[in-house]
Amino acid sequence: MFRVSKKIKKCKKMLKSWSKDHFGSVKRQIAKTKELLWKAEEDAAKGGSYGPVSQIRRELNVLLDKESRMWKQRARTQWVAKGDKNTSYFHGVATQRKRRNFIKGIKDEEGVWQSAKGTISGIFMEYYTRLFTQSNPHELDRVLEGVQQVVIADMNAELVKPYTMEEVDIAIKQMAPLKAPGPDGMPPLFYQSFWEKIGPDVSEAVLSCLNSGTLLKSINHTFITLIPKVNNPETVMEFRPISLCNVIYKIISKAIANRLKPFLNSIVSEAQSAFTADRLIADNILIAFESLHYMKTQILGREGFMALKLDMSKAYNRVE
């Protein structure tokens, strides 16, 4: 695992240098090539050769394609605009996202507006530190006594058996190619494109983690980005934290998810309609509506009913 992590860091450094040479100045290269094309066309119109015009046009098309792909990756959109050139669309998407995600200020716990950069970061740090820190609960054994055992011996045997190279290959192929990268700076597309070359080393590292239960600390490093839930967010709770993980970490978690997937319908209660295949979160909305309708229209008998609505904020962030 350490050897692969070191290779990724070295590759990232080399790719940054390569990107600067080939993409960093692409706008200037396009402007310069357009100027050369204009001069070549002018010379050809005066009786010169048309050969340079064709050559420069090909070079310009390559540069324009680079620019389009660069902005498409930055936009990270799944929708492909129709037409020959999508650069302006992708540039607009990327710029709009950057502008929308910029945090100009936030209200603190007292409701006072804070706009200083250090104060804003401190407010978010304090909130999420409190959210993700355990509260030292007691008597967990008594709680677990009331949880019915649903994983039978055959299921457990399948879940704990050693992971294989095939499971790692399936996991990397299932990942969206241009998802935002984590601290490693690599999108899944890099691994997918060069899997034939880097696959054996990466698979060995992933399997060492899955089958030993140990993970290198640097692989677990994660960027947290805050996405606004509303158009003009004013409080910390109006932002949704998104974790940008290293690709190796994503492969590990994807392989585990694939292993669990066939058993989820048997493990997860039928009352839970989200996060499992062939179930819709809208089903529970219909059940709630029908239940309330029955309670409202029920007129026979003396037995009454009561509905209790619980709003558990951040219910999936911590289990204790």
Predicted features, each with a name:
Residues 2, 6-9, 13, 24, ...:
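Amphipathic alpha-helical interface elements that mediate macromolecular binding in regulatory proteins
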Residues 56, 72-73, 216-219, 235-237, ...:
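Intrinsically disordered, low-complexity regulatory regions enriched in Ser/Pro/Gly/Thr
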Residues 26, 259-272, 296-300, 305:
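Active-site palm subdomain of RNA-directed nucleic acid polymerases
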Residues 105-107, 179-186, 235-244, 285-320:
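Conserved catalytic palm subdomain of right-hand nucleotidyl-transferase polymerases, strongest
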Residues 75-237, 243, 251:
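Surface-exposed loop/turn segments and immediately adjacent short secondary-structure elements
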Residues 84, 175, 183, 228-230, ...:
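Residues immediately flanking
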Residues 12, 19, 237-268, 282-292, ...:
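Conserved pre-motif C helix in the palm subdomain of viral-like polymerases
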Residues 1-115, 129, 157-161, 174:
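Arg/Lys-enriched, amphipathic patches
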